[in-house]
Amino acid sequence: MAKKVAAVVKIQLPAGKATPAPPVGTALGPHGVNIMAFCKEFNERTAKDAGLIIPVVITIYADRSFSFITKTPPAAVLLKKAAGIESGSPQPNKQKVGKITREQLREIAEIKMKDLNASDIEAAMRMIAGTARSMGIEIV
């Protein structure tokens, strides 16, 4: 028989740097999950993605066990990394803060493809391009 799901928690954590301190402790503590076990497993799985923010969906079962799925980093994080900027533009239509090439846009779309609701790579590229525009990043 399948385990009974008690809760589903979604949080974004830096890859390889999960600690029992907030936000992990405050999200998992009330559910009685072994926080250190989660941190250890998460850090092992995401060590290769150091420096990126990784969204994670944690399914907590009634017997206090858990399983989790890591998603791809948010498009905004990947765009900032590709453009070499710290943050997006405060006025995206007036003030451009960075540039990326179509090739970089395609790479980001390929990374994000499995998490996007897009049927082909061109549709995914258009979605990522929209995010870039709203951040003040120009596509050349």
From Swiss-Prot:
The superkingdom of the source organism is: Bacteria
Per its UniProt record, what SMART domains does this chain match? RL11
Tell me how the protein is altered or processed after translation. Answer: One or more lysine residues are methylated.
- Which GO CC annotations does the UniProt entry carry? cytosolic large ribosomal subunit
Instruction: List the disulfide bonds in this chain.
Output: none
Q: Which GO terms describe its molecular function?
A: large ribosomal subunit rRNA binding; structural constituent of ribosome
Say if the entry is tagged with keyword ATP-binding.
no
Alphabetically list the UniProt keywords: Methylation, Ribonucleoprotein, Ribosomal protein, RNA-binding, rRNA-binding
One biological process term in Gene Ontology: translation
Keyword rRNA-binding in annotation: yes
Role summary = Forms part of the ribosomal stalk which helps the ribosome interact with GTP-bound translation factors.
Tell me its family. Answer: Belongs to the universal ribosomal protein uL11 family.
Return the PANTHER family for the record.
60S RIBOSOMAL PROTEIN L12, LARGE RIBOSOMAL SUBUNIT PROTEIN UL11M
> How does this polypeptide assemble, per the annotation?
Part of the ribosomal stalk of the 50S ribosomal subunit. Interacts with L10 and the large rRNA to form the base of the stalk. L10 forms an elongated spine to which L12 dimers bind in a sequential fashion forming a multimeric L10(L12)X complex.
This one is known as: Large ribosomal subunit protein uL11
